Amino acid sequence: MHCRIFTLADQIAFAELSGDNNPLHVDPVVARRSLFGQPIAHGVHTLMWALDEWLEGRTAPVRFKQLRVAFLKQIGLNQEVRFNLVSQQNNRVRIDVIKENEVAVRMVFEWLADEASYRGNVSPDLPEQQPPDLLGEEEIRRSHGFLDLYLQPETARRLFPNLARFLSPVQSAVLLGMTRLVGVKCPGLQSIFSELNLTADAADDGQRIKYAVAEFDERYGLVLLTVAAPRLRGTIRAFIRPPPQAQASFENLKPLVGDAAFAEQRALVIGGSRGLGEVTAKLLAAAGAHVQLTYRMGKSDAERIVGEIIEGGGQASLCELDILRPDWSGLTLPTHLYYFASPLISGSAKADFSSALFHAFCDYYVNGFAAIVELFQKKGLRNVFYPSTVFIDEMPANFLEYAMAKQAGEMLCQAFEKKYPQMRFYCPRLPKMATDQTVSFHQVQNPDPVPILLTALQNFGDSIVSR
């Protein structure tokens, strides 16, 4: 069985070969704020790996007469995928790349023996690493241009040994150019590759990739490009990803609360560098609390939030903390604990229960939470805010593991209250709100978290226990 796990090192190596250094694929800190919540493998990286697997055992060079590829599911780093040769009749081949029993990439192609009569103008250098373009809507509509072809032989042989031996170098360079086009040029920074269709065209003997936007539907973020390359012609279908969800500024939140409503609190906000934790930290600081917020990866986001609070007259500090491998030494003793630590909230495939996913949620919502409560209750912590979810009541099929883990967290809070009668735990079941965790390609208007969290914090304040 041909299986593969794409690592961050693999992604960086492919970015060097292709020139597609889009942070969605190579920067875990930036990618954590995408709708995927983590870096994902380049679609073309997966395509070229599958083609390399297919070419294993070949003895003669080939080239594509036609190639159709659909990138159906994102592939996260360290997720196992499987090569599946679905059919091979004469010179027509269909291959699927399978992730968690679903087709992630589907390719259908026709091939010919490569007579080696055309080699084109392919540079043997690595392409220059350029920052991906961030294009506005009108810039996308007008986008067109040319891309040079690159194929660095040593790197290509290391990453794709069979492709380097048996696929036309021009066609390998074209595939690499297609991912650079989408990830760096158009749509660029916020892109996601959806489909690639190429057909042999003997009349086109150009030396570069020529591209132009043929259609742009801003309602869905759909971009259709026409492409022409040496002896190839076709189309690319790509989408524009929604940007990270921005939250209300500290200055805009200050008028919503009394400036001394939470003045007695030394608030520790676990997971305060974005989303609900960010809003909570700002609301608490606006109401007079001294806030310490933690981050795991998003140091720059945490620094921005703390700077915003201090500049606005509030009190705030930050501390790095990985709740799964905690170093508690940088935390100050809180009077109030607000627990927003969370992994990527993803649903299970086809609504099938996933024990691994359930335990991954429990690591955050139960085990990590229990550890920090036990640590600070010994030092006098009395008040704990544990955000739960309405999914416990609604039980959506694809999020059973998430709801179960949150309900286990609620039960843990109840057990702690019995074990430690001096403590109070508040577990509001919050609705889905506008955060990085809930952005999607579909234009869904999730509610603003500010009024919902403000009400929850006020209710929590009414039930707190004095020291």
Regions found by a protein language model. Name each.
Residues I309-P326:
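Rossmann-fold cofactor-recognition segment
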Residues S273-R274:
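Conserved glycine-rich cofactor-binding loop
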Residues I240-P242, C427-P431, T435-R467:
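C-terminal helical subdomain
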Residues M1-P39, S117-P169:
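Catalytic strand-loop segment that frames the active site of acyl-thioester-processing enzymes
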Residues M1-I5, T59, F64-E138, S194-A267:
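HotDog/MaoC-like acyl-thioester-processing domains
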Residues N21, R32, P39-R63, T155-N197:
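Active-site helix/loop of acyl-thioester processing domains in fatty-acid/polyketide metabolism
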Residues A289-R304:
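Conserved glycine-rich Rossmann-like NAD(P)H-binding loop of the short-chain dehydrogenase/reductase
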Residues K254, S342-Y420, R429-D436, H442:
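Catalytic loop of short-chain dehydrogenase/reductase
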